[in-house]
Amino acid sequence: MKKQWIIACLAGVLTAGVQAQQSNYVSEVWVADQGNGTYKNPVLYADYSDPDVCRVGDDFYLTSSSFGCLPGLQILHSKDLVNWSIISAAVPAALPPVTTPERPEHGNRVWAPSIRHHNGEFYIFWGDPDQGIFMVKSSRAEGPWSKPVLVKEIKGIIDTCPIWDEDGKV
């Protein structure tokens, strides 16, 4: 009888602990917008390294390094620089073939892209440290995007950004 009472008490204590943990657990989605005109950091609760933003009218478009991951060059849209949504990927399925590098790659491929809007077209330029400077373009941020084009074959280049001169040349 005493043994059964001890087992019942232990079972009650152990079960109460599990129930307390279950009732306290709340899974929340991160929201930076406080709903009162303020926000809390981080605005983007994810790894969007080397972000670049361009403004077209009242809209903001962001892209960031995607390295060797696919879909690559995700495009995010915002009206207020706080609330962002993914609207497309400029490199959805494949990157250009890689020539064998002289040494191992460490997260290369798409580094520090630059997104710009010029003469009704969106352009994204990025550097691949082993191959050179690539570019994709689209008339709409939602896509479809062109296939990546190797603009300049060169090693060791990252953090590219286009500038258009008065003649319209990049």
What are these model-derived regions, one by one?
Residues I7-A16:
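Bacterial N-terminal signal peptides
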